[in-house]
Amino acid sequence: MFGGAKGGHFGVPPAGYSGAVPQSEAGTKAGPAGGRPADTMWRVRCKAKGGTHLLQGLSSRTRLRELQGQIAAITGIAPGSQRILVGYPPECLDLSDRDITLGDLPIQSGDMLIVEEDQTRPKASPAFSKYGAPSYVREALPVLTRTAVPADNSCLFTSVYYVVEGGVLNPACAPEMRRLIAQIVASDPVLYSEAILGKTNEDYCDWIRRDDTWGGAIEISILSKFYQCEICVVDTQTVRIDRFGEDAGYTKRVLLIYDGIHYDPLQRNFPDPDTPPLTIFSSNDDIVLVQALELADEARRKRQFTDVNRFTLRCMICQKGLTGQAEARDHARETGHTNFGEV
């Protein structure tokens, strides 16, 4: 989970908090409290007869069997026939204990693994090939998935909490996160002006505290700064990624998926049941962005999105029918009504 934030169980600031992150604390919010470093994603390549490949989803906690499963899927060399060499001069890894973690092997991020087929061992079945790996190998690869959170007007806050806390689903966090955002905005009326917020600073703070309002780009930007991480939102309608905090130099990245009206968190699941899902990624892990776009494209092809310019809404206060977010915005401006439901 994200550790350095102070004042509450997930980072609500104490009284008098200015909204700015002290320079001395930069870099502490993205790792666990205490001396144990965060388990970051490794960048490891493997070189085999067919070329050089980047391996996905590895860390010090990855088990050798998962590494060999990836290599098998990429190279077509079955785990039992692999020879893996590392270092200079290259030395063979001991592959006898397939449950050992990479952190206990002489491998580190940035290494190039040389993979060869051990000719002294029985060859794999002809059915085992680079593009036809057996199902057990395909299943051994980590997969990026979405986790559904309640559609209760606070899905953004629940989703952000889920990813920064390492996979904790707690919809009850929303009021606290809303108060956090209001306190940060109120602390800097110059930065968070009416031109930015679309309403006065005071009105915005009252508005965001309510449980019937939706979060969006402003709130994501604030949470990105507070948690000192890049928040990437992949849009299933346009199949694009909006990256908040991209240029801030953060070392961590979390991902949400957005269908036009609802946010869900994304996580990487591993086949080993003892390996917890990963929700916090290295900002250098661009593979996870590709995987997120693949998820979004699949959802778009299945039309799992809401066109916010054409969807039908009803004002839950006066029951007036509306079409699209523009009409809803105009209605809210004219009447002060902000509680809408999709028809």
Swiss-Prot record:
* Stretch list, region UBX-like: 45-123
Does the record bear Metal-binding in its keywords? yes
Annotated region (Cys-loop), positions in chain: 149-155
Region of interest: Variable-loop: 208-218
Task: Report TM segments.
Answer: none
Cite the Pfam families for this sequence.
Answer: OTU (PF02338), OTU1_UBXL (PF21403), zf-C2H2_OTU1_C (PF24560)
Top enzyme class of this protein?
hydrolase
InterPro entries found in the cross-reference section: OTU1_Ubl, OTU_dom, Papain-like_cys_pep_sf, Ubiquitin-like_domsf, Znf_C2H2_type
Arranged from A to Z, the UniProt key words for this protein are: Cytoplasm, Hydrolase, Metal-binding, Protease, Thiol protease, Ubl conjugation pathway, Unfolded protein response, Zinc, Zinc-finger
* GO biological process annotation, one example: endoplasmic reticulum unfolded protein response
> What EC number is given for this enzyme?
3.4.19.12
Instruction: Give a Gene Ontology cellular component term annotated to this protein.
Output: cytoplasm
Residues that, per the record, bind substrate:
I261
Active site (record annotation): D152, C155, H262, H337
Catalyzed reaction equations: Thiol-dependent hydrolysis of ester, thioester, amide, peptide and isopeptide bonds formed by the C-terminal Gly of ubiquitin (a 76-residue protein attached to proteins as an intracellular targeting signal)
Report C2H2-type zinc finger ranges. 313-337
The keyword Protease appears for this protein: yes
State where the protein is found: Cytoplasm
Molecular function (GO) terms for this protein are: cysteine-type deubiquitinase activity; K48-linked deubiquitinase activity; ubiquitin protein ligase binding; zinc ion binding
Locate the region His-loop: 258-262
Please state what the annotation says regarding this protein's domains. Answer: The UBAX-like region mediates the interaction with VCP. The C2H2-type zinc finger mediates specificity for 'Lys-27'-, 'Lys-29'- and 'Lys-33'-linked polyubiquitin chains but not for 'Lys-11'-linked ubiquitin chains. Selectivity for 'Lys-11'-linked ubiquitin chains is provided by recognition of the sequence surrounding 'Lys-11' in ubiquitin. The S2 site region provides specificity for longer 'Lys-11'-linked ubiquitin chains.
Function (record text): Hydrolase that can remove conjugated ubiquitin from proteins and participates in endoplasmic reticulum-associated degradation (ERAD) for misfolded lumenal proteins. May act by triming the ubiquitin chain on the associated substrate to facilitate their threading through the VCP/p97 pore. Ubiquitin moieties on substrates may present a steric impediment to the threading process when the substrate is transferred to the VCP pore and threaded through VCP's axial channel. Mediates deubiquitination of 'Lys-27'-, 'Lys-29'- and 'Lys-33'-linked polyubiquitin chains.
Q: How does it assemble?
A: Interacts with VCP; the interaction is direct. Interacts with FAF2/UBXD8. Interacts with DERL1; however interaction is dependent on the UBAX-like region, suggesting that it may be indirect. Interacts with PLAA, UBXN6 and VCP; may form a complex involved in macroautophagy.
**Protein name (Swiss-Prot/TrEMBL):** Ubiquitin thioesterase OTU1
Source organism lineage? Answer: Eukaryota, Metazoa, Chordata, Craniata, Vertebrata
Q: Report the gene name.
A: Yod1
